[in-house]
């Protein structure tokens, strides 16, 4: 068959059998080369080059044209994992089509492979973390459930011979900033409860329920060992306890952090660092230090047999992806290039952007606006109104066309008055055009912008420009150029990609107050990848929409909501705190007073919150212990068709040290005006897993539990029943 000479060339054998045979024929130098993220070809054995590092955070990234979906935190706000799976099925279609075309040229470069380093299922424990927008929020169950949808969409059906792609759960583990400390930071005092109850459950779910094929180890140290050299994390927990059989990849440059000056300082040099990482279970390095593995073997720091364990794993993965086999055998290679940025995918991007929008405030039902009356009375303002780059978030692809919020509004109602008014943090307004983006070795991206014009406004200038308009749609917030991965950016409220304050930038706050004081109807469209402190804006703005970084179709989605063609149904996947005073120290990983589960104060907007143009009523829940489900009626009591998200939380009253409540299920329900549906939501015994201090494990314990069912995490929005297991 196909002129095979060796067993590894036989597609009828299992990936593990083929990998073992191929590994046995490789030299130690060849083995070291295939353990790098840019795996070079081994020509004498017919092993093609392979790129382990590709990106698909919310669309195929850094690899030419693709469909750009909303940021992950925005997609989490949809509370719709079925829709999310459709999104990532589209993403994997585009990724496979791109890879097939590239392979046929004879060369597969960086970002063009079949291994995609997503999803990010770290817990967004603090709104100041610049990379929180990559996650699915602050709740472990939400990250697990949405992460499972991502894995299903990317990897394809588990029972097929060949995987569609490989997904990667990252960053393992206990990783969420600060960005500027990640290469030297040590977390050595975390309680077992926080580790197992908060930071690990999503990873466990993706390994044991999702069959995720890759896990990425994080930069920082955990209990004095770098995560990529942690025997406890990578061997004892991940492989021994959870049964993970896949590939561990390192974050980019993480092995260098073992030995470079001013970082972790746990290894003398790259050779020793590489030996430590491989011995701990890190199979593929994003970087170049693993080229020193032959030297490590010669010095007795690691055996070739230990290296073979990793090589067999990664080769088995490549065989499973069909990397060695003819396209005629691999079903996924038939996906045509025409799927890339196709109309169906753009429609899906619009649907997800619509579903992600959260209506935070709607005083006197000012929204939706009329499309036919008084549109000449509307003025659009703000630093994000005409900014296409804002739409893309971070780790983005290149859309064939982006619709800014201004364009979306004009698509809906025709030309409207517009003034940028200010930049994100300054009254000096720069009008820019997008230049090129460049990626550093560690994966950080620099977007170079060319400045076309610059002017400095005063509030008086803006009020004069707005004098003839009664309704101001102010598209503000912050920017993915300021909150992102390890950004070398300094601006008021921002530091190296993280935020130093959650408050809306002062220049925007002052403008909104001035517009309000001038008698304008003010609608704030807040664009951000994280929670923003908006206490003054609840007074100065008549309506507030949280639209995140909404992707290439974001402008159309925002316009659909503003003008009533789509009834908002998004819910917050994070707590919106009132101000900075409610936040613990950023570098403290203790969960005390963090997130809705442990926060003791009164938030501005709670986790799970989101308004609608209609109203809903949730009936009394009934729990059937034997069947393992909750039954509850939901009625649309208003005049608009819409969707409500029924949320199910549990708590253990006897556990006074535990969370106030914990999300364990949710269901999105579509209802016509006046319609009632009875919703059945599974709530099985496994959903009652709870921390047991006597065994230091998460397990289902006998006793009393409260089941809380409603429309947000706020007690006032929940109905409670007690059950005994």
Predicted regions and their residues:
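A conserved ligand/cofactor-binding region detector
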Residues: 719
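Glycoside hydrolase catalytic-domain context in secreted enzymes
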Residues: 1-691, 697-715, 724-725
């Amino acid at each position: 068959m196909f002129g095979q000479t060796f067993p590894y060339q036989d597609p009828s054998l299992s990936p593990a059998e083929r990998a073992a045979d191929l590994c046995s024929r490789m030299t130690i130098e060849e083995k070291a080369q295939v353990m790098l993220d840019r795996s070079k070809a081994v020509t004498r054995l017919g092993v093609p080059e392979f790129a382990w590092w590709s990106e698909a955070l919310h669309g195929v990234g850094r690899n030419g044209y693709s469909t750009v979906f909303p940021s992950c935190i925005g997609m989490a706000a949809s509370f719709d994992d079925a829709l999310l799976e459709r999104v990532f099925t589209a993403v994997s279609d585009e990724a496979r089509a791109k890879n097939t075309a590239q392979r046929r040229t004879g060369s597969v470069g960086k970002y063009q492979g079949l291994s995609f380093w997503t999803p990010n299922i770290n817990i967004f424990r603090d709104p100041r973390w610049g990379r929180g927008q990559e996650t699915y929020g602050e709740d472990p169950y939400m990250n697990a459930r949405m992460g499972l949808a991502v894995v299903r969409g990317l990897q394809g059906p588990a029972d097929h011979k060949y995987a569609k792609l490989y997904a990667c759960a990252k960053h393992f583990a206990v990783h969420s900033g600060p960005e500027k400390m990640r290469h030297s930071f040590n977390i050595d005092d975390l309680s077992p409860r926080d580790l197992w109850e908060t930071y690990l459950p999503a990873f466990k779910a993706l390994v044991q329920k999702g069959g995720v094929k890759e896990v990425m180890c994080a930069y920082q140290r955990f209990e004095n060992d770098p995560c990529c050299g942690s025997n406890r994390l990578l061997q004892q927990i991940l492989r021994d306890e959870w049964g993970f059989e896949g590939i561990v990849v390192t974050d980019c440059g993480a092995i260098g952090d073992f030995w470079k000056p001013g970082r972790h300082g746990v290894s003398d040099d790259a050779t020793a660092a590489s030996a430590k990482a491989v011995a701990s279970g890190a199979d593929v390095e994003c970087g170049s230090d693993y080229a020193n593995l032959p030297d490590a073997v010669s010095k007795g720091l690691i055996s070739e047999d230990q290296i073979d364990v990793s090589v067999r794993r990664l080769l088995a993965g490549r065989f499973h992806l069909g990397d060695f086999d003819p396209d005629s055998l691999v079903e996924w290679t038939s996906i045509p290039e025409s799927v890339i940025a196709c109309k169906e995918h753009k429609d899906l991007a619009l649907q997800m952007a619509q579903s992600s929008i959260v209506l935070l405030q709607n005083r006197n039902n000012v929204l939706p606006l009329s499309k036919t009356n008084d549109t000449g009375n509307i003025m659009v303002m703000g630093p994000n109104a005409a900014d296409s780059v804002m739409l893309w978030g971070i780790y983005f692809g290149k859309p064939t066309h982006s619709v800014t919020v201004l364009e979306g509004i004009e698509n809906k109602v025709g030309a409207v008055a517009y003034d940028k008014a200010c930049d994100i943090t300054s009254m000096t307004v720069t009008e820019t055009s997008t230049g090129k983006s460049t990626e550093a070795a560690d994966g950080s991206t620099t977007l170079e912008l060319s400045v076309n014009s610059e002017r400095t406004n005063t509030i008086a200038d803006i009020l004069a420009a707005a004098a003839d308009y009664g309704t101001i749609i102010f598209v503000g917030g912050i920017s993915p150029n300021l909150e992102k991965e390890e950004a070398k950016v300094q601006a008021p409220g921002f530091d190296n990609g993280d935020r130093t304050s959650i408050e809306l930038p002062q220049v925007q706050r002052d403008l909104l107050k001035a517009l309000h004081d001038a008698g304008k109807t003010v609608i704030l469209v807040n664009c951000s990848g994280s929670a923003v402190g908006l206490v003054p804006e609840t007074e100065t703005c008549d309506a507030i929409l949280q639209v995140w970084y909404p992707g290439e179709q974001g402008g159309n989605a925002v316009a659909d909501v503003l003008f009533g063609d789509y009834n908002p149904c998004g819910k917050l996947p994070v707590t919106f705190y009132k101000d900075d005073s409610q936040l613990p120290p950023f570098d403290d990983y203790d969960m005390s007073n963090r997130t809705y589960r442990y926060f003791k104060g009164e938030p501005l907007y709670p986790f799970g919150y989101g308004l609608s143009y209609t109203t809903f009523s949730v009936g009394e829940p009934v729990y059937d212990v034997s069947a393992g489900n909750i039954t509850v009626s939901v009625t649309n009591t208003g005049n608009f068709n819409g969707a409500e998200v029924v949320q199910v939380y549990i708590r253990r009253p006897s556990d006074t040290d535990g969370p106030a409540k914990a999300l364990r299920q949710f269901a999105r329900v579509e209802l016509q005006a006046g319609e009632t549906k009875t919703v059945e939501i599974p709530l099985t015994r496994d959903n009652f897993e709870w921390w047991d201090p006597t065994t230091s494990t998460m397990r289902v314990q006998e006793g009393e539990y409260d089941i809380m069912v409603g429309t947000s995490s706020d007690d006032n929005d929940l109905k409670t029943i007690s059950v005994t297991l």
